[in-house]
Amino acid sequence: MNTFIWLIRREFWENRAIWIVPAVIGVALTVAALFGRIDFHTVVPADQQRMIGPTVLLAYGFTFFAVMSIYSSWYLMECLYADRKDRSVLFWKSLPISDTATVLAKLFTGVIAIPLVYFIAADVSTLLMAFIVSMRAHAYLGSVLWQPGLWLQLHVLWLYVIATTGIWFLPFTGWLLLVSAWAKRAVILWLVLPPLALYAAEQWFFGSHIFGSQLAERALGYLPRAFHDQSNPSAWTSATIGTDVITVPSSVWHVLNPIGFLSSAATWAGVLVGAAMIYGAIQLRLRCSES
């Protein structure tokens, strides 16, 4: 366990962008809250006031999550390749650390540690934003931003998304690690060209698109399985702001669908595929180290 923790710390030492990028985003959003324009005079109807808190907090959270998704994917694509590129793999191989532990530490960093860092950064910056906006707008916005139940739901949503996306997108994660362990150069080309070639070959020789359909299902199938849809009107709240109709969940508890997600065969089929690719990355790392 101590070795694994040390490996995680090593990833943070060598990849300072893990914490620098979310810190920069947090500072930028805090500055925007401090100096941005707030309309103190417009009278907002009660139904729209109920929308302000969830909409603002979700927008802040989505900003961090979008950047986190891009950076985490980039990290997983580069982590094993970079060790070989700068030949630091030879140094780490000289230590009593297994290749399995090294790959799993990088997997943990990309799937769990980085999302948690962004979660903490989003939490702190959102608290600062709410405090600044409340002070600037006095009681006008304070009552809609400082709701303990809303903050609890935001935290639960973040942790739920971290856990479920880590499971659902494990095939993509495994592919990123596999390519990172295999490619000697042009990692992005190795990442993209084999799936495209397989898709084209299936279309050419068999006239089918099963592979492409499975990729699309994996890329787009997360939300329908992890969350309930809008079939239950009582679970959603809508309000018209200007010419736009904004709809948000009346409560996070109404839209989370952990039972449906965990009982889906597609979820666990993806886990098996992802685990196989991660195992392949470990074997490639071992062979690379031996050669």
PLM-predicted stretches and their roles:
Residues M1-A23:
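Aromatic- and glycine-rich beta-strand/loop motifs that create alpha-glucan
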Residues I8, L178-I188, G242, S250-S291:
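Junction motif at the cytosolic side of a transmembrane helix
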Residues A17-T42, Y60-S73, L193-F206:
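Hydrophobic alpha-helical transmembrane segments of multi-pass membrane transport/permease proteins
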Residues T30, L34, Q48-W74, L104-A181, ...:
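Secretory targeting signals
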Residues C79-T109:
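Helix-loop-helix units of permease transmembrane domains in multi-pass membrane transporters
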Residues A183-S231:
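Transmembrane helix segments
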